[in-house]
């Protein structure tokens, strides 16, 4: 039996689900459901969780942010973020440093793919970069 695919999920995919953003909600929710069901091994970059916490508590409350992140951690792994991650990201020729950190995090957790809606932000890509709908079509 082939091993299940490993993906690093960009924060915008989570926000599509949490904020029910159309027309992206359906495919992003299907991706998270596949991770929750164990069909895919999903990772988030560590810094995405701090940003997510901030955005949730700004609109709702700290308690709600804690509850949502606690739930996510039941089925999503956290990609390590250390000095090596930062140093490698600094050496990527990306306009946005946060995107470089995401890409290096994906490489370090041995992801098969980085799933995002902003494919153009991850060039040059060190591994495949796909939208949720496109990745789901590969399953």
Positions of the model-derived regions?
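Alpha-helix boundary recognition
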Residues: 33-36, 70-74, 90-91, 107, ...
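General small-molecule cofactor/ligand-binding pocket signal
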Residues: 43, 79, 130
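Acidic, PIN/NYN-like endoribonuclease modules and their adjacent C-terminal/linker elements
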Residues: 1-6, 30, 75, 107-139
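Active-site neighborhoods of divalent-metal-dependent phosphate/nucleic-acid chemistry enzymes
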Residues: 2, 76-119
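Active-site-proximal, substrate-binding regions of enzyme catalytic domains
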Residues: 29-32, 49-77, 84-85
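A generic structural signal for short hydrophobic patches within well-formed alpha-helices
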Residues: 14, 49, 86, 122, ...
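Short, well-structured N-terminal submotif of metal-dependent ribonuclease cores
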Residues: 1-44, 57-64, 124, 138-139
